[in-house]
């Protein structure tokens, strides 16, 4: 083993500088933070050659006392803390006392500063960490510091610097973050003698956003806030139309400090997930004000990361604030259309016997897969029963003797499906013989559920709570104009034109219904009379094995059927009559693409795929009753405004919008 050497001060300072000072923008960041801590209200940053040749910071802060000028450049010399305990209640940008020592050790640094109580200031010049002179000088109150020839004495670091244009861009970015974090401070960035960025310190965050970005972004913002005992979360999030394909327009500030945090970003994006298209990222500026003792800012050399005491609570606070703000904004946009006062939602207690014709012993609901009628698209058959999912969930139709007692039915109706609910056994106390005998299947031309029977003796004492949604005054002033291209539904209401994407709207309805069933454990399945056998590759089979619980919880009954082969026996009822193999493989491929993501994200996308594949498609002709049913289903959703993939379900044109298009008004 080699001999252990004690490094000299110059070497240790250069090594320390390598951690704190990565590039010229790091110098700007550290020096501007010092100016902010000094209470400056006007800060000017001048750079040349991307900061490699010159960085000059001028502020009107409190300044440095003459006696402290030399000490300011010593390692770990700071006015911010006195002991280790102070780190955990720090409220300033800087606290380590490393910045000036690190910067001066790898550059030529000149500093002039004056406090208000002195008639003159002090000037110090340091080259490569060595003080060349210290003298009195005349200057304004505040501090001016010039850093030139950065890394001139560290050739190895110098040759790894990026181009001047790249460094200029990085400096512009960090200055923009300062403008957002401190709307009450005026910042002025001058690059090669020309003004590059200018803010006016109005104290208005929207003014800062407009300065940093543009008018379009500043006019498409949604305000959000959530205040708790120890934390306040507030800021702006952009409307979906200003989302981008990257996260460059996202800013997080914790106690005014610009940081990067994956879990905070995830909280905002998850709250925005259902409102954005795939692979789009929202614009946001989020501020988190929290008591210093609940965070640790001393976890990264550049202080660009923070650690929270309770990340779970933080995630929920951020998610709730953003999600409620977005929902509120969308609701306001469609207030006239989604007027909840027009919908009378009431609870009624009805016995099953009152809902279903009594007198028979059979319970049977087969579906003809060969039928071309869209009987299950909007529940025109099934939903004649109030909330039939709630009804069916209490009926276990999957008894072994269903098929055993009716061999003729099994052989003659290969394209029919049975409904089953695997999660609820409320009728187990009844005698199975009372409801498991099958007399005759429903005929293919049946248009309702009148042949769904229960023995009267078994149902007289049974009742369930049924929640119905009855239109009250909604259709009074609504006019269904029709379909455009059998894809878009046109509706007139209160002198406004609404255009609904029928696929996106129905997809959202199915998604919410299916998601609710999974969350409550009420997934109703259909028994396939002809099980679907699928051969998978080894990779596909492994993906299925890793995620088979997702399929099970979603209403699929899948069994291994030999090596790399599966047998699908049941699919979710809500899907109607899907192409089982295509649907299964689509979900499998999505799971493969998302294998590194959170379980909740995988489940969300799996449900979205199910809904997308089962929804009415573009170019499907809909009857007026089907359109009305779709609108009714949308009305009871918390968020009917976007499909699961983030596309809008509808757009609105006011009379004023149309008259502007036709130049009737200006």
Swiss-Prot record:
Cellular compartments per GO CC: mismatch repair complex
A Gene Ontology molecular function term of the record: ATP-dependent DNA damage sensor activity
Pfam families the record matches: DNA_mis_repair (PF01119), HATPase_c_3 (PF13589), MutL_C (PF08676)
Entry keyword set: DNA damage, DNA repair
One Gene Ontology term from the biological process aspect of the record: mismatch repair
InterPro entries, per database record: DNA_mismatch_repair_CS, DNA_mismatch_repair_MutL, DNA_mismatch_S5_2-like, HATPase_C_sf, MutL/Mlh/PMS, MutL/Mlh/Pms-like, MutL_C, MutL_C_dimsub
Signal peptide from the UniProt entry: none
Cysteine-cysteine disulfides: none
Functional description taken from the UniProt entry: This protein is involved in the repair of mismatches in DNA. It is required for dam-dependent methyl-directed DNA mismatch repair. May act as a 'molecular matchmaker', a protein that promotes the formation of a stable complex between two or more DNA-binding proteins in an ATP-dependent manner without itself being part of a final effector complex.
Sequence similarity: Belongs to the DNA mismatch repair MutL/HexB family.
Protein name: DNA mismatch repair protein MutL
Naturally occurring in which organism (per UniProt): Clostridium botulinum (strain 657 / Type Ba4)
Lineage: Bacteria, Bacillati, Bacillota, Clostridia, Eubacteriales
